[in-house]
Structure formats: structure tokens, C-alpha cells
Amino acid sequence: MNAPTLPFPDVAELLPHRGTMLLLDRVTGFTEDAATVQATPEAGAWYADAQGGMPAWIGLELMAQAVGVHVGLAHHYQGLPQKAGVLLGTRSYRSAVASFPAGVPMVVHAAMAFRDPSGLGSYECTISHPGNPTLLAEATLKVFEPEDFHAFVQENPA
């Protein structure tokens, strides 16, 4: 893998999400085993609660997008094309808050715990505020990156 260079690519280059479904602001760190991104809830967004915050359950999607950034950057630095993947599930998503306040940046960290050649993987993910080690949310995500996403979807209709 080529050594990561700054600045990192824009998250829109690494994820298939567009418009209001792209919840991450930028990449702040990358290693072979982990990615760190920033996300800032917006008060007027589609998900905003009565106080303008982001409900904590959306933290799961923030984590999934952080995993996608990690895989996307790994492909980027290896000179490989981007591929779609899927979130299979999570084990015990825990949040210390009911919502993430609008306008307050958060650090979303996704660390690869396991990855096999078939594309099956597991990531330990956390959400916190910059400079504050107190966790706002944490979970283990199970993910899958099929070799041929379109064939996978055809074989596994919803």
C-alpha cells in the first residue's frame, strides 16, 4: 500500500452516499487498520430532533460510513477502484447520550478488528468529541464487501 498523503480525499470520493445521506464532514486520520473522521450534526437536517440534535441511533450510520471511509482509503492508496459494501449488523450499540447536539463536531473512529479474504470484516467503532476521551457511543460493526456487489444484491433480494 502506498503511504497515506495529506490532504486526504474528500469523503464523497470514498463513499457512495450523496446529498443529505452523506453525514461525514472530512477524514482526519488513516492507518492500515483504522480511520478517523469528523461529523457535525446540523440543526435543520432531515434527522434533527425537536432541539435540532441528531438522535443517537444515527450514530450507527456514522460508524458505518467511517468503516466505508477506511475501506475506501485502503482501496485508494492501493490504486484500486472503489467498491460497495454492506453493514450486516452490530453487536450492542451503546450510547451515553440521547442525541448529539447540533453544530458540535464529533470524532468517529473505526478500527478494524478482523477482515478475511472473502470480504467479511468486523470493526470496533467509537464516537466522541475532539480532545475529550469520554465516549458518546460505541459498537462493534459486522460488514461485508462482496467481490461483485450487483451479483450479491441479485442473489440476496431484500
Predicted regions span which residues?
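Short aromatic-glycine motifs in intrinsically disordered, low-complexity regions
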Residues: 8-18
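A generic structural motif
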Residues: 28-31, 94, 114-116, 145
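HotDog/MaoC-like acyl-thioester-processing domains
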Residues: 3, 69, 99-107, 111-158
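Compact, glycine-rich, soluble single-domain proteins
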Residues: 51-70, 84-85
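Hydrophobic beta-strand-centered segment that forms part of the acyl-chain substrate-binding groove
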Residues: 69-107
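Polybasic, low-complexity association/targeting segments
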Residues: 1-8
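Catalytic strand-loop segment that frames the active site of acyl-thioester-processing enzymes
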Residues: 19-55
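Small-residue-enriched segments and motifs
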Residues: 22-25, 88, 108-110, 139
